[in-house]
Amino acid sequence: MKTGKELKPGTVLRIDNDPWLVQKAEFTKSGRNSAIMKTKLKNLLTGYKTETVYGADDKLDDVILDRKEATLSFISGDSYTFMDTTDYTMYELNAEDIDAVLPYIEEGMEDICEAVFFEGRLVSVELPTTISRQVVYTENAARGDTSGKVMKPAKLKNGTEIQVADFIQIDEWIDIDTRDNSFKGRSKK
């Protein structure tokens, strides 16, 4: 059991026997009313999204999900097939099931993912917090524009755009924080 004030992104709740993922949680306390938690939830079985408000002391059922290591095996249209690294079982997910990690998924990636299961059914995939990706296009840095932290847009192999430091060049590998889509530095790859 969790209370409303303990909710945070990544928490999974059981509401009407379905697992709901907390995607965003914002704690609000006003002088007149009691504290509340505004949340954005996603149903892991249907993909339906909603916004809900909970009181700080509301009791909520949390769910413990099973997790297994997996790798991306192949992509076929909007279908993504992952393979369990221990018993080589194949699992398939649609693009809408993994919309949060979609910008980082690309054919041939070697990252170990976490396959997330609810009652034996694969419902989502989570990536490591730091991944390495190759920059395929970026502009040259503007000369003399060096006061402070200077960033510029860069395009990755799968088409995702990210803000990188001005010294990053085309074909370099960079580390990305998947929690907030931020540039961490050059990769050691």
Curated annotation (Swiss-Prot):
Compartments reported by the entry: Cytoplasm
Main location: cytoplasm
Gene Ontology CC entries for this record: cytoplasm
InterPro entries in alphabetical order: Elong-fact-P_C, NA-bd_OB-fold, Rib_uL2_dom2, Transl_elong_fac_P/YeiP, Transl_elong_KOW-like, Transl_elong_P/YeiP_cen, Transl_elongation_fac_P, Translation_prot_SH3-like_sf
Cross-referenced SMART domains: EFP, Elong-fact-P_C
GO biological process, one term: peptide biosynthetic process
Pathway where this protein functions: Protein biosynthesis; polypeptide chain elongation
Record's keyword terms, sorted: Cytoplasm, Elongation factor, Protein biosynthesis
Pfam families registered for this protein in UniProt: EFP (PF01132), EFP_N (PF08207), Elong-fact-P_C (PF09285)
GO molecular function annotation: translation elongation factor activity
Annotated function: Involved in peptide bond synthesis. Stimulates efficient translation and peptide-bond synthesis on native or reconstituted 70S ribosomes in vitro. Probably functions indirectly by altering the affinity of the ribosome for aminoacyl-tRNA, thus increasing their reactivity as acceptors for peptidyl transferase.
Protein family: Belongs to the elongation factor P family.
HAMAP family: EF_P
Name recorded for this polypeptide: Elongation factor P
Naturally occurring in which organism (per UniProt): Pseudomonas putida (strain GB-1)
Gene designation per UniProt: efp
